[in-house]
Amino acid sequence: MPEHGHGHGHHGHGGQMTPEQQMQMMQQEIRLAKNLSQIKHKIVVMSGKGGVGKSTVAANIAETLQAMGYKTGILDADIHGPNVPKMLGIEMLEEQFNQYQFDVFKELVEKDLDTSLPEEEQREFIEEKKKEYQHSIFPVETESGLKVMSMAFLIDSLDRPIIWRGPQKTGAIKQLISDAHWGKLDFLVIDNPPGTGDEPLTVLQSIPETDLVLMVTTPNVVSQEDVLKCVKMVEMMNIKNIGLIENMAYYICPHCDETLHIFGEGNGKAFADEMEITYLGDLPIKESVAESPTKDATISVLDPDDEVSKRFVEIVEDIKKEFLE
């Protein structure tokens, strides 16, 4: 059975790594490269600060891609607010997640096990499989087939804040990326922690050949200033493909469907032009989106006639056209 240790990145005295730790790290790098090589396109979703709807955007883009027929995964790397599973209607903490791991592994073994073999050989086969998957963490699949991996699955209570030191956080993020067993995917969407600290940086460093870094902002100036810092960090890492989505840009009245641009119009576009990054459109404030974390699922796939769902389909089409063709 795959083991999921939570002892992330403990170094020897004085920050020096023992040969054993160096070996483990190299093996992790190899697993990471192998895992990511099976994924065609990677989209990292970022924001300068929390509260701009970054996770909602990431979850909806993943759902939209999956609904369009692409094999898609979403990695919720936001350690402090891992709320993607909740948005997708997955209620699973550490205990249930460990059971899920066991069930998936059992299924894998049973699929390939030749029961006509002598018992001894069957046992050997199972041991081999255990070895093969000892580091694998299997993402949870939603009804639509979207694969989901989140920090939320590795904690025993959602009420308990995750209090870790820096190296433990980056170690945990790295483990999620290297050990999640995605299989072949067309798209992996990564919901990055907000800001420009070690955690978002770890994600960018761990994922080579990111096809797109998607910045989520809102019309207020502070949100834009924070995004500017993020854009500079991404550019320093030599990632050229950066797109911007302006979330909560206008209001749709739930009663008459009238569109109200309460913050003025065209802010996001002007901001993206100024930073010389690609503007991918705006999204409204809408009652159903604001409620979505408590609802059972994100909105886009639930209601294909919905204005917001249509916007996500347009945004995904633009992403494909601008960055992937």
Regions found by a protein language model. Name each.
Residues 1-49, 93:
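Extreme N-terminal, non-catalytic leader segments
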Residues 42-80:
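Walker A/P-loop phosphate-binding motif and the immediately C-terminal alpha-helix
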Residues 72, 77-155, 170:
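Phosphate-binding loop that captures ATP/GTP phosphates
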Residues 149, 173, 192, 205, ...:
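Glycine-rich phosphate-binding loops of nucleotide-dependent enzymes
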Residues 150, 155-197:
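Cytosolic-facing regulatory segments adjacent to core modules
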Residues 179-182, 186-291:
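Conserved catalytic-core segment of NTP-binding enzymes
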Residues 295-306:
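C-terminal boundary of histidine-terminating zinc-finger modules
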Residues 316-325:
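Short, hydrophobic alpha-helical segments
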